[in-house]
């Protein structure tokens, strides 16, 4: 089962995702962190999220790309909720850090790149009780450089590709919640 939480940065997505994860009824709750810390601002953001989770019963895995690898590190994955924070970081990491995929996004309209990530996410979702995915949706701006515009487009493509697979989609930008019945 997949729950997708979409919003703008600092919109409360993380707090909502944690609430869903902790109240989901599964005995184990994994926080799957995708952020690569590269500077002091990243350290502060990571520390803020760690503090939010402190004492709540999460165990943490840090996997910046190829998130389907998390399954092998989870004891009894079928009884586990996984909170993936966040898809935005994952897309950037796949674009720049994954040695096998970092050029894939440049080859076509992005379909092969987004399909590869979607495949990883669906494999993870098929192996765990509940996968909660936190993601951003950014507004495009003509002043952004080409690579940034590509990143925004790829993230949006992946968000749209996930929606049909999600049991519920919560869009904090519009305040809507859709339950699809998947």
Q: Model-predicted segments: where are they?
A:
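Conserved P-loop
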Residues: 2-75
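A structural micro-motif
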Residues: 27, 56-58, 80, 129, ...
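Residue-level signal for inorganic ion chemistry
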Residues: 17, 49, 83, 136, ...
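Generic beta-sheet signal
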Residues: 3-5, 29, 78-89, 131-133
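Helix-adjacent hinge/juxtasegments
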Residues: 56-111
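Short, glycine/serine-rich, charged loops/turns that create anion-binding
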Residues: 10, 36, 88, 138-139, ...
